[in-house]
């Protein structure tokens, strides 16, 4: 997958768990909790969706690496090529 | 033969707007079936029916705003003869204060109603787009805001983008002014009628944290637990020891509840708060509580709560999650008589066996109704929650 495809997939899963977010208004460096208002339950639902889509384990210790769309895209790209 | 009417979804609700029918005349319904979606100050709510029968006639059109108690449908039971119902007299129906309703496509024979998030609904209405023409990518094929936006790209753009209410990243489908009014009405009533008392207690969470980390390490994400589920479960179980915290206060006084319908305060992005309940939570294990919480949060976000969930709570838990402040002192949600608040769990200096050590802890608070209980009983309640959290693996 290209970085653009990974980012698009991430945003799609983010909108899936938070359908009230406007995809056009999400910035690459928006913090999922502080800026986009995800709570811990939303975040876990997002991790579940990403786990299903990419078949990656995403342990709890890696959660900080998903803090923003740009960090998450970088993390997912790294894990997918690892 | 009986009438299905606009339900009251809270003491402060005066009217609701029928958004869609999920049944049509001739359909058989069972108790608990979801038959309609009504938009209220709390957003779109799925309305369940509380009797079995056959829909004889729909008496209201999608788009109509109707007062609580207004007839929505006629239900025939097995004994009924053919219905002989006068058609609804339009002049009796109060005129909506809003402009004419968006055209919601009727529920047709082709595949039934289309679930959609409130944001998607509102955007589609703004654009004059029938939801049935939009491919849904949400759970169960639900139409999401992004689907509506994608749908518009295939069409001529509207001359100007309609103004959104709420913040730039808020929830456009929800009228935040109305929701704020509903919250104000309920909280004013609470502060006017309920003599609150407040208690606070620090609870060490290292036992719960250790158990949680060990449990989650072996699980895929969709089976992982959150600390919030352990906090809710401990609260629900502690009520067995202090039943006077669980129930409803009505005109006749306090009525304890045999079941624990545990309300969860869920904050909405852009503002506002809804506290839907997990019914019959008293015997649920951690996994089931977690699953119910996930389901409630997901459906709150997607605008798919049911009326029983928002009207039948017997206590509320309000948790600030993992990134909030230390403690919250809540306002009881009438007619309930207690609210348990949890601040953000944080590593704090704890004294254990005379030694100062850093450890994860949370401040639990109780707001309770002095007409029903005293601080002494409230203290027993918080102490029991503490005790249960020290043994998170107990069945």
Language model features with spans:
Chain A
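Phosphopantetheine-dependent thiolation modules in NRPS/PKS and related acyl-activating systems
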Residues: 2-38, 48, 52-82
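Two-component histidine kinase catalytic core, primarily the HATPase_c
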Residues: 42
């Amino acid at each position: 997958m290209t970085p653009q495809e990974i980012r698009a997939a991430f945003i799609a899963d983010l909108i899936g768990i938070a359908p009230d977010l406007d995809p056009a208004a999400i910035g690459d460096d928006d913090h999922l909790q502080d800026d986009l208002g995800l709570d811990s339950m939303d975040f876990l639902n997002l991790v579940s969706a990403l786990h299903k889509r990419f078949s990656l384990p995403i342990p709890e210790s890696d959660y900080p690496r998903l803090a923003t769309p740009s960090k998450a895209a970088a993390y997912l790209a790294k894990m997918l090529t690892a | 033969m009986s009438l299905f009417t606009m339900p009251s979804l809270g003491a402060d609700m005066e009217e609701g707007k029928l958004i869609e029918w999920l049944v049509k005349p001739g359909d058989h319904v069972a108790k608990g079936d979801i038959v309609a979606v009504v938009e209220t100050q709390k957003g779109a709510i799925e309305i369940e029916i509380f009797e079995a029968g056959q829909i004889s006639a729909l008496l209201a059109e999608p788009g109509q705003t109707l007062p609580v108690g207004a007839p929505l449908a006629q239900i025939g039971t097995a004994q009924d003869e053919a219905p002989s119902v006068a058609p609804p007299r339009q002049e009796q129906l109060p005129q909506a204060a809003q402009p004419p309703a968006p055209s919601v496509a009727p529920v047709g024979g082709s595949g039934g109603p289309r679930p959609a998030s409130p944001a998607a609904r509102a955007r589609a209405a703004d654009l004059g787009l029938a939801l049935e023409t939009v491919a849904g990518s949400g759970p169960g094929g639900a139409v999401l805001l992004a689907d509506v936006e994608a749908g518009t790209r295939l069409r001529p753009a509207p001359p100007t983008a309609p103004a959104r209410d709420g913040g730039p990243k808020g929830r456009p489908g929800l009228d935040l002014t109305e929701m704020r009014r509903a919250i104000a009405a309920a909280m004013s009533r609470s502060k006017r009628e309920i003599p609150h008392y407040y208690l606070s207690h620090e609870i060490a969470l290292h036992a719960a944290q250790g158990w949680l980390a060990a449990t989650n390490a072996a699980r895929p994400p969709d089976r992982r637990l959150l600390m919030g589920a352990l906090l809710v479960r401990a609260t629900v179980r502690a009520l067995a020891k202090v039943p006077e915290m669980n129930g409803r206060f009505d005109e006749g006084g306090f009525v304890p509840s045999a079941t624990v319908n545990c309300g969860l305060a869920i904050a909405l992005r852009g503002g506002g708060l809804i506290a839907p309940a997990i019914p019959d939570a008293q015997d649920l294990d951690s996994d089931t509580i977690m699953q119910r919480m996930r389901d409630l949060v997901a459906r709150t976000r997607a605008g798919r709560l049911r009326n029983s969930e928002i009207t039948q709570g017997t206590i509320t838990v309000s948790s600030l999650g993992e990134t909030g402040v230390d403690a919250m002192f809540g306002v009881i949600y009438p007619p309930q008589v207690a609210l348990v608040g949890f601040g953000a769990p944080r590593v704090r200096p704890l004294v254990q066996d005379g030694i100062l050590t850093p450890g994860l802890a949370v401040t639990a608070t109780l707001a309770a109704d002095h007409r029903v209980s005293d601080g002494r009983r409230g203290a027993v309640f918080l102490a029991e929650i503490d005790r249960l959290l020290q043994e998170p693996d107990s069945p």
